[in-house]
Amino acid sequence: YSPIIIDLENGKKVEITGKIDRIDIAKTVEDKYIRIIDYKSSVKNIELNSVYAGLQLQLLTYLDAACKEEDVLPAGVLYFNLIDPIIKSSKNMSEEDIENEIRKKFKMQGLILADINIVKMMDNKLEKGASTIVPAYIGKDGDLSQTKTSGVSRKQFEYLQKYMNKIIKQIS
């Protein structure tokens, strides 16, 4: 993707470059969605207070660059832990239990679009309960849980992208 160019008030420009580890694209009848994934060697999550402080802008910057290059909507910005998980247990576990525990350790963390259809595209086996892939939870009523899902609306993603640009201007 092309670098992001931000015009400063003093007439200068800031050019931001980086390498996106992974971009997933999903299409619906009406729209095309992207999910930005950053590989990490430790467990990491997006903390909105860190975004607010200008300390955690990388994934939002990548999202902004990808959205400007293509006609796409954000589906999520996520971290994927690459460390081989160690499962500890005081009891004997079946292979299935061990696999479930490993899946939990590899679950991506971050922000996703709070849209049940998009969530189900990210985890096509999710019917009810917690996703083993993304930070989402579908309740017994079949709706996306607002308290157990790290979800934001399209408007909130737009706001976060605008805020990221504002912070970069301020710190440049």
Question: Where do the protein language model's features map onto the residues?
Answer:
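Structural signature of nuclease core domains in nucleic-acid processing machines
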Residues: 1-172
